[in-house]
Amino acid sequence: MQGLVLQLTRAGFLMLLWVFIWSVLRILKTDIYAPTGAVMMRRGLALRGTLLGARQRRHAARYLVVTEGALTGARITLSEQPVLIGRADDSTLVLTDDYASTRHARLSMRGSEWYVEDLGSTNGTYLDRAKVTTAVRVPIGTPVRIGKTAIELRP
């Protein structure tokens, strides 16, 4: 009888250990691959309608600057038209990056804010080390990484 209790205790402890490991891995996975769009959108909504609105318009992004990669130093003057980024010849910003897809990402203006969205690329688009899964607001000076290329919005 004591042998049976000991075996059941061991099996129960082993099962609890595996449940703990599984929960830790699940939490790590959600932290690493969590979409950041909701948090960024909430921050944008909280600032709308305050005194920062006028300040943001004054310091609105006017340029898209390549800060890392083969095109470092390249600058695009922004208009209200979306900016297509990728290796395709008809992209606004044509990348020679092996890790960029043909149609990799799109920067588009919504109101007075710029948003980046991944267009189903293979290697993903990152906003300040967070993977972009939905359209996410891009603050001025925050790097957007596409492969080995990093771009920023500048006033």
Curated annotation (Swiss-Prot):
Residues 83-132 form the FHA domain. It is found in: Cell membrane. One of its GO terms (molecular function) is mRNA binding. GO terms for cellular component: extracellular region; plasma membrane. The chain crosses the membrane at residues 6-28. Changing S101A: Impairs interaction with PknB. Does not affect interaction with PapA5. InterPro entries: Cell_Proc_Reg/RNA_Proc, FHA_dom, SMAD_FHA_dom_sf. Pfam families: FHA (PF00498). Phosphorylated by PknB. Dephosphorylated by PstP. Changing T50A: Does not affect phosphorylation. Changing T36A: Lack of phosphorylation. The modification Phosphothreonine is found at T36. Interacts with (phosphorylated) PknB via the FHA domain. Interacts with PapA5 via a phosphoindependent interaction involving N-terminal residues preceding the FHA domain. This is FHA domain-containing protein FhaB. It comes from Mycobacterium tuberculosis (strain ATCC 25618 / H37Rv).
